[in-house]
Each structure stands twice: as C-alpha cells, then as structure tokens.
C-alpha cells in the first residue's frame, strides 16, 4: 500500500482527481484509469451526500417557518370576528440572535479520499524501446523550452545605457574636458572647442513646471455670486389636510371594536415638527409660602387671622429684631376691633399659634432674620419702614414740640418761625400745602417767603446731625 503520486488540482479545492499520464504501458494505463474512476466515484458520492444533507436542513427550517405561519393565521382567524379591543405589544428588540451565525460551506470538513493508500500492482510487461522520431514529433505539441522570466519593460534611455564594469573612477563617466555625463544624457559636443555647456541649474530651470493660468474670475475680473448653502434638514410637511365630517361612533361594524375609546387630546403630532413647541409640565399642588407679616403689640407677636376673611391692616409696621422699636403705634379706626385687648393677657414667652417655625424657635439670629426676609418677599411685600422714615418722624415730632413751645410766647419771631416751618412743609409735600395760606394776611406771607429760614431756637448742640433741615 503506497500513497498516490503527484496530483494536478486547482488551489483551494478539497478534492483533486488525478490525471492519467501519457505513454504508459497498457497495464499501467488500465490500472490508473480504474483508480481515477474509483476516486471520482467517491468524490461524487461525497458531494451528493453533502448536498442532500443541506437540502434536508433547509426543508426542516422551511417546515418550522410554515408551522409558525399557520399558527399565526389560526390566531388571526380566531380574533377576526371579535368586537373587543385587543392590544398588541411589539418586542423592543428584533427577534434575532445577537451574533449572527456565519455561513458554512457545504464542503466544510470534507477530506480528500485520494490521500488514502491504494493497492500497488506489479506489472510483468516490459517498456517499449525508445523512438527518437516519436519524441521529435511530440515536441511540436508539447513546448519544452518555455521562458518564464518576465520581459523587462522597454525604457526610453537618453544616455549610453548601463555602466560598464571596467570603469574605475567617476571621471570616466564624463565626456573629456566637459561636465556632461554621457551615460545619463548623450550629447554631441566638441571637447576641444571650448563650448559653454549648460549647467544642471540651468537645465533644471528650463524643465521647471509653470503655474497654471489664473481662473476666469481673476483674469477677467468677473464677480462670482455667493452660493446659498442647501438646507439638508428634515422638514416634514403634511400639506392640505381635508376636514372630514364623520360621526363619532358607528355601531355594528364588522372588524371594529365597540369598547375602544380614543382620547381627543392626543398631544402634538410628530409631523410637521414644531421647533418651538414646549410641552406643558404637570402642575403640582404644593403649599405656597405666604409673605410673613408679624404684628408687634406690647412686645408679643400676634397670630395672623385665618385666610378666608380678609386680614385687617396691622396697627403697627413690622419691626425686626436688630432694629430699635418705633414710637407707639397710632390708634386703630373705630370700626376695627382692637387686637391688643385680646392678646394682652398672653405670656410673652409662649409661642404664637400659626407663626412660622423660624420665628417660634430660631436656630441662629442671622439665619432666622435672612429667612424671614426671604419669606416676607423683601421690603416691598413686608411693608417695612426704613431708618430714614423713622428719622423723619422724629424730626416732625421735634418740630411740633418746638412749634408748641414757641407758639406760647406770642412774639414776632416765634410767629415768623412757625409760618416758615409750615411753608417749608407745604413746599416739600410733607405737610398740608395750604399751611402758608391760612395766615392772617397775604403781605405777611410774602414777607415770610423773602426771609431765609432761621435755625430753631433752644436747640441742643448734640442733636445737630439728626435735626438738619431737609431740602
């Protein structure tokens, strides 16, 4: 048992059928023909068996798909006559494996049966004698001397060609008495004539490529129009949608569910897209912080009245902890009940019901003050008085006391001072504007206007900064 000899086959093929060599003896030719036919039979049997297996596999896959189709068709026929709404949930992922199965060749795993050992036969016949004439005839049909070397490409050579092997120096490459390399570029020159030859710099300057001509827009001074960039954004358009007047409910329709109700508010459509449409956020029912307006009466914070009835105005403006207390509040109108009577018996240390937590139990003075200011909404909502207003009130009170003190004298200077004070109040808008016209006569008023204001009499020297006249 010996392995087969050299086989002539194509590259990449699993099977290789051997060829029968010419000029064999009769017994050798018969044996090789039988072996080749037997090998070909094995190869063909293997190929057809593999094809049959692949066909059976494809048939089983088609049968499974057909069963799924018939099952889906039966389900559709079952629910076709139903009048109830049916929800169909589609899978979020495509029903396919994450990694696709690679395609396998039908000849994957096939082995060449020719690699198996075949029986060795002994032939008794002798070789035929050599015939020279027959060999010469075969040379006409079977070329023996084939030049497999690729032919070199014909290159256009300007010089003498390749360098000879007997050149020993670089000067042998140059033409006598010149700088021309004849092996690179052959030129006809007289070495003894002393002709000036072109240098390599000059030759390079001649062969230097020139720039292309300027475009027509530059050469002819033409003005190119600016190209408007194309808009590639997707802008869907529904066009003219006709208004169809149909009834909202059509009973007893085949294939239409009766228990399905559609909501009229389906939200904004997806086409055409509204670039500036902002969806409305859901409303959350939360408690809105009301501005804090504490009432200070007799050193005790009073609770704010309940929300349903309108709260009466506070008898005194709110005062923070870090600000000195204001003068006694004015009396409330006769129509409103007094709050101080009800809350007078309450202890100052007890917390007031309904007051914010920060006021009842402050954690730190500064944080509580800032938080109460934020809840109150600032000066505009809390109706807090500034220090400047309190100074003005103090000035008014002192002026009134001075007017009362000077009005008791009855002299000319005190009357003049009173008239000037009333005149200045009317001009500045801080008092009644008719104060100057209530005098005994117009001449006295004109005289009071022409006299500059005098400093108030009996003014203590330590209160000059606080009692300056307001312009």
Swiss-Prot record:
Give the primary localization class. membrane
| Lineage top rank: taxon | Eukaryota
Specify residue ranges for compositional bias: Pro residues. Answer: 304-336
What ranges does the record give for the region VCA, renumbered to this chain?
Answer: 353-471
Question: What are the UniProt keywords, alphabetically?
Answer: Actin-binding, Cytoplasm, Cytoplasmic vesicle, Cytoskeleton, Endosome, Membrane, Protein transport, Transport
Taken from the UniProt entry, a GO cellular component term is: recycling endosome membrane
**Where does this one sit in the cell?**
Early endosome membrane; Recycling endosome membrane; Late endosome; Cytoplasmic vesicle, Autophagosome
Gene Ontology biological-process annotations? Arp2/3 complex-mediated actin nucleation; endocytic recycling; endosomal transport; exocytosis; protein transport; retrograde transport, endosome to Golgi
The similarity annotation says: Belongs to the WASH1 family.
Self-association or partners: how does it assemble? Component of the WASH core complex also described as WASH regulatory complex SHRC composed of WASHC1, WASHC2, WASHC3, WASHC4 and WASHC5. The WASH core complex associates with the F-actin-capping protein dimer (formed by CAPZA1, CAPZA2 or CAPZA3 and CAPZB); the assembly has been initially described as WASH complex. Interacts (via WHD1 region) with WASHC2; the interaction is direct. Interacts with alpha-tubulin. Interacts with BECN1; WASHC1 and AMBRA1 can competitively interact with BECN1. Interacts with BLOC1S2; may associate with the BLOC-1 complex.
PANTHER family, A to Z: CXYORF1, WAS PROTEIN FAMILY HOMOLOG 2-RELATED
This chain belongs to the protein called WASH complex subunit 1
């Amino acid at each position: 048992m010996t392995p087969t000899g050299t086989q002539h086959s194509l590259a990449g093929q699993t099977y290789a059928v051997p060829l029968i060599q010419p000029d064999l003896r009769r017994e050798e030719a018969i044996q090789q023909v039988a072996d080749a036919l037997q090998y070909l039979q094995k190869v063909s049997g293997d190929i057809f068996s593999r094809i049959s297996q692949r066909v059976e596999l494809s048939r089983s896959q088609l049968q499974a798909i057909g069963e799924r189709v018939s099952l889906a068709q039966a389900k559709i026929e079952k629910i076709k006559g139903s009048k109830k709404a049916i929800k169909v949930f589609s899978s979020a992922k495509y029903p396919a494996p994450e990694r696709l199965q690679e395609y396998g060749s039908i000849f994957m795993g096939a082995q060449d049966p020719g690699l198996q050992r075949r029986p060795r036969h002994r032939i008794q016949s002798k070789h035929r004698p050599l015939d020279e004439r027959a060999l010469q005839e075969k040379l006409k049909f079977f070329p023996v001397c084939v030049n497999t070397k690729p032919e070199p490409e014909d290159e256009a050579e300007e010089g003498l060609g390749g360098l000879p092997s007997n050149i020993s120096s670089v000067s042998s490459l140059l033409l006598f008495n010149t700088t021309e390399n004849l092996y690179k570029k052959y030129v006809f020159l007289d070495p003894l004539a002393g002709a000036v030859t072109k240098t390599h710099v000059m030759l390079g300057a001649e062969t230097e490529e020139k720039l292309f001509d300027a475009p027509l827009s530059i050469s002819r001074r033409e003005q190119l129009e600016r190209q408007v960039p194309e808009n590639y954004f997707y802008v869907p358009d529904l066009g003219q949608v006709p208004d169809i007047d149909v009834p909202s409910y059509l009973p007893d329709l085949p294939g239409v569910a009766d228990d399905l109700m559609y909501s009229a508010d389906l939200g904004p459509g997806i086409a055409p897209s509204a670039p500036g449409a902002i969806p409305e956020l859901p409303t959350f029912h939360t408690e809105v912080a009301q501005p804090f307006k504490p009432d200070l009466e007799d050193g005790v914070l009073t609770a704010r009245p309940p929300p349903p009835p309108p709260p009466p105005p506070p008898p005194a403006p709110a005062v923070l902890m870090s600000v000195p207390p204001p003068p006694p509040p004015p009396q409330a109108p006769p129509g409103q009940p007094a709050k101080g009577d009800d809350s007078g018996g309450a202890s100052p240390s007890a917390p007031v019901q309904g007051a914010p937590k920060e006021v009842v139990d402050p954690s730190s003075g500064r944080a509580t003050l800032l938080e109460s200011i934020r809840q109150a909404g600032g000066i505009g909502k809390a109706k807090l008085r500034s220090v400047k207003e309190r100074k003005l009130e103090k000035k008014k009170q002192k002026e009134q006391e001075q007017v009362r003190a000077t009005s008791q004298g009855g002299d000319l200077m005190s009357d003049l001072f009173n008239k000037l004070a009333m005149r200045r109040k009317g001009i500045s808008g801080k008092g009644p504007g008719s104060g100057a016209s209530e005098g005994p006569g117009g001449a006295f008023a004109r005289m009071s206007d022409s006299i500059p204001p005098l400093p108030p009499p009996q003014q203590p020297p330590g209160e000059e900064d606080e009692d300056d006249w307001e312009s």
